[in-house]
Amino acid sequence: MAPPGMRLRSGRSTGAPLTRGSCRKRNRSPERCDLGDDLHLQPRRKHVADSVDGRECGPHTLPIPGSPTVFTSGLPAFVSSPTLPVAPIPSPAPATPLPPPALLPPVTTSSSPIPPSHPVSPGTTDTHSPSPALPPTQSPESSQRPPLSSPTGRPDSSTPMRPPPSQQTTPPHSPTTPPPEPPSKSSPDSLAPSTLRSLRKRRLSSPQGPSTLNPICQSPPVSPPRCDFANRSVYPPWATESPIYVGSSSDGDTPPRQPPTSPISIGSSSPSEGSWGDDTAMLVLLAEIAEEASKNEKECSENNQAGEDNGDNEISKESQVDKDDNDNKDDEEEQETDEEDEEDDEEDDEEDDEEDDEEDDEEDDEEDDEEEDEEEDEEEDEEEDEEEEEDEEDDDDEDNEDEEDDEEEDKKEDEEDGGDGNKTLSIQSSQQQQEPQQQEPQQQEPQQQEPQQQEPQQQEPQQQEPQQQEPQQREPQQREPQQREPQQREPQQREPQQREPQQREPQQREPQQREPQQREPQQREPQQREPQQQEPQQQEPQQQEPQQQEPQQQEPQQQEPQQQEPQQQEPQQQEPQQQEPQQQEPQQQEPQQQDEQQQDEQQQDEQQQDEQQQDEQQQDEQQQDEQQQDEQEQQDEQQQDEQQQQDEQEQQEEQEQQEEQQQDEQQQDEQQQDEQQQDEQEQQDEQQQDEQQQQDEQEQQEEQEQQEEQEQQEEQEQQEEQEQELEEQEQELEEQEQELEEQEQELEEQEQELEEQEQELEEQEQELEEQEQELEEQEQELEEQEQELEEQEQELEEQEQELEEQEQELEEQEQELEEQEQEQELEEVEEQEQEQEEQELEEVEEQEQEQEEQEEQELEEVEEQEEQELEEVEEQEEQELEEVEEQEQQGVEQQEQETVEEPIILHGSSSEDEMEVDYPVVSTHEQIASSPPGDNTPDDDPQPGPSREYRYVLRTSPPHRPGVRMRRVPVTHPKKPHPRYQQPPVPYRQIDDCPAKARPQHIFYRRFLGKDGRRDPKCQWKFAVIFWGNDPYGLKKLSQAFQFGGVKAGPVSCLPHPGPDQSPITYCVYVYCQNKDTSKKVQMARLAWEASHPLAGNLQSSIVKFKKPLPLTQPGENQGPGDSPQEMT
């Protein structure tokens, strides 16, 4: 059996190149990723390879003969996978199942037979997965079924679980695939998400089968399938449902492979069988394996590079093939499980060296459970080294079982989503993981149980060997491979399954019972056939159950009385079945693989079909190990009754050489066997029920196992009678086997042609790769040139940016110069304006002086006229006085009249004073100037007119009058704002200081300005914003609102009058700021206020800059410079 390191460690220890990067994301080491390659290369890992092969990528994944392109194992299974060494087997199986298993192979393709063999060949992994998977597995039935369901239960337990994978993997084997599905369903639970990822990857990689197909090359794709399977088988304890598939993936891969791949499972089993049965067969298988391994390694190396991704897809397909092979082999390997385990152990030792290295890495990542299985195998092979590793792996198994539950869920998703590869991987992984989970419950202490299992495994191989020695040609050839596989697989599976069988023989008896239950769906037909088989072969149902249990419990059965009896019964069954395979191998190689695939479906339906398919799988393995087939023929002679039944089955297989003939014959034979085995299986069902109880109670398991051993002994007696009948049938089967061998040779030739075609395709692929590399190099050169151009462009852009910066600097300098020029121009313009203003003022003063002079001249003329009039009046008065003198009385009266006249003049002068009061009202100088001549005009009334003004002039000195008359302001001149508007605002100490009507605006501006409104002691007052409009009231509220530490508004003022008298007056307010940014923000604040308050008037604004800072730093200075634009420069 495979060295303890077989799975991960042998792969690692082998140091086989871990080329597979895609093997599993979970792979703890790149080596595990290469498990597939290492597994193929390493014989140590026979068990691991069996489990790994079936589960992971191993020969089982390789077995996808149908798709040589998909898998390197697509080549004759022996060629593609070192464990495949039995090429003849692949040739018979490939006739029908190969292509479907190739694409669908792992789970659904011809994997229907695979499930039985699968648990056996994966015995380590599958037995673990079936039995360990059973307790931890989602359903004990599914877990128990996988051995049974692997033969028959696959449709039953795995049909509910796996149907999607089967549908995905192989529509032809969809019934088979549905059985994988349950493990996949369970496997998603147990599988870690990483396992699902690796499974998905392997699905992707598996499509490129050729690279993955080579188990020997173990192109990372090939090994990754094992990794997936091993990881899945280990990780998904649910795999127990699929454990058959998990086993199938290792062994089951061979059935789907069986055309080419069956050599892997069979090769793994047949080399072990050859070693146990015929060493020469093993040597031949090993030699074929070594040759194919070298070829596959080349292909794998090529395909690994080109097809690592494909390898994943191929792995998924290989896993499908493995599962299909597992189904076929599970059927046959349940019977041939011991043989296949031994053969698979030997083939797996080689393949495990290659595959186990890859699978070990993959399995380690995939499942520490598989590591436990590997360690169990290693414990058998390297019990001491592996016991420690098993301790670790036992812990890992528990962790992996948890991961497996997650992975089972993930795989359910993957199987639903990920198609065949994931399902098969999940199934195998679930089987493997169910095995580890079951191993954990049953291996609860994997180390202890492993040693126990190793002991029982060793004992079982010993028991099996004695039992095999009793039927040694039967069992040694069959069970020694099976024991080797069981011992390897049983070490792995028996360690888990010895854990399980010992712990789970009740549990596996329950699985057997559950398997009948699981078989009931899967074996419900089989059980119906079992009753039939129990009638004809109740020993075989027990044998099948034991064999199925042996896939699950072959270790336990071999380990325990049931194992001994089923081992004997299995040898009996395996002898006829192996005789049938021998006879049926030529006939059944094509039909058997087809039949195995169909029989897997039927055997999933029927236990005997499972057994027969196990026989067929064993036959495939026997076909791979033709020498073992001789041993099996000897066993067949011993099991002539079974062989006769198997001869009938072989005749049925001959009738159904196209899958259905053999299946029908096998169904008929199996129905006969079912009649015999219905009693046996009824007994076994009772035993399995006892085993289920024993799964609950290990002690009951032992008692039930003893009972089962007794029943099996009875059945063996019945089987001995049947063996005599089978011996007759075996002779017929031998003839059929010869025909099958011829067909196998033809298939081998076809496989060789396919290999040559594959090589040509690989060469073409290499050429394409080289061309692609050249194109890539050219692209890289172009990219480098583009990068250089980009760098040059960047440099040019940088230079342009520098030039732009320089231009900007020049522009800034120009702008500064322009600003300076503008300032100078402004200064010049202001100076000119001031000069013009001064000149205008001087002119106005001169005009005023001239006007005053003219007025004075006019006044002088008026005074002269008045003097003349006064002189004339005096003359008249003198004349009157003379007359008065002449007439004294008259003279007195005249004097009185003169005195009366003087007051009139005075009154007139007073009226003239009133006129002076009227002058201010009559604001025009013209009226003032025209009034004296108007007075002068009425000379007739000297008293009212001229006398008034004259006296007015006399009494008001002319120099004073011009000052009064200088007020020449027109009526329409703009008036200054009312004094209440002109009061400069005082800074507010608190908000209440702000007038109530201006307070909302003040608060709004304070929030808007924020920090900008605060006083900055470092800044000076050099900026202002001038707001102007026609509403002095709104401007007053604005000036009251803009009162902050860094923003201060002056009082309301008015702009200079534009010119025409009737133009409206424009009022303004200056808001002084400390910097330009604040002044801009003040403008924005007013615009924001106007936007939110439609009734507020729209004010125009402009920013003003001062050369010299304004003295606004002291808070005490309440200056409102806003009213004087002179402050602006």
Swiss-Prot record:
Biased composition (Pro residues): 85-104, 161-185
GO cellular component, one term: host cell nucleus
Region (Disordered): 1-988, 1110-1129
Compositionally skewed regions (Acidic residues) per UniProt: 324-419, 597-888
Chain intervals with Basic residues compositional bias: 962-979
Protein location: Host nucleus
Keyword field: DNA-binding, Host nucleus, Host-virus interaction, Inhibition of host NF-kappa-B by virus
Composition bias type Low complexity, residue spans: 186-197, 263-275, 431-471, 529-596
InterPro entries linked: EBNA1_DNA-bd_sf, LANA1_DNA-bd
Keyword RNA-binding carried by entry: no
Disulfide bonds listed in the record: none
N-terminal signal peptide: none
Comp. bias (Basic and acidic residues): 28-41, 48-58, 292-301, 314-323, 472-528
DNA damage is among the record's keywords: no
One of the GO BP terms on file: viral life cycle
Region listing for DNA-binding domain, in residue ranges: 1008-1129
GO function terms (MF aspect): DNA binding; transcription coactivator activity
Feature: compositional bias, Polar residues: 139-156, 207-217, 924-934
Subunit structure: Homooligomer. Interacts with host BRD2. Interacts with host RELA, ELOB, ELOC and CUL5; these interactions induce the proteasomal degradation of host RELA. Interacts with host TRIM28 and NFE2L2/NRF2; these interactions are essential for the shutdown of lytic gene expression during the early stage of infection. Interacts (via N-terminus) with host histones H2A and H2B; these interactions are essential to dock LANA1 onto chromosomes. Interacts with host BUB1 and PCNA. Interacts with host NAP1L1; this interaction is required for LANA1-dependent DNA replication.
Cited function: Multifunctional protein that plays a role in the replication and long-term persistence of the viral episomal genome in dividing cells. Binds to mitotic chromosomes via its N-terminal region and to a 16-bp imperfect palindrome within the origin of replication (oriP) located in the viral terminal repeat (TR) through its C-terminal. Tethers viral episomes to chromosomes during mitosis. Plays a critical role in the shutdown of lytic gene expression during the early stage of infection by interacting with host TRIM28.
Protein name per Swiss-Prot or TrEMBL: Protein LANA1
Taxonomic source organism: Human herpesvirus 8 type P (isolate GK18)
This protein's encoding gene: LANA1
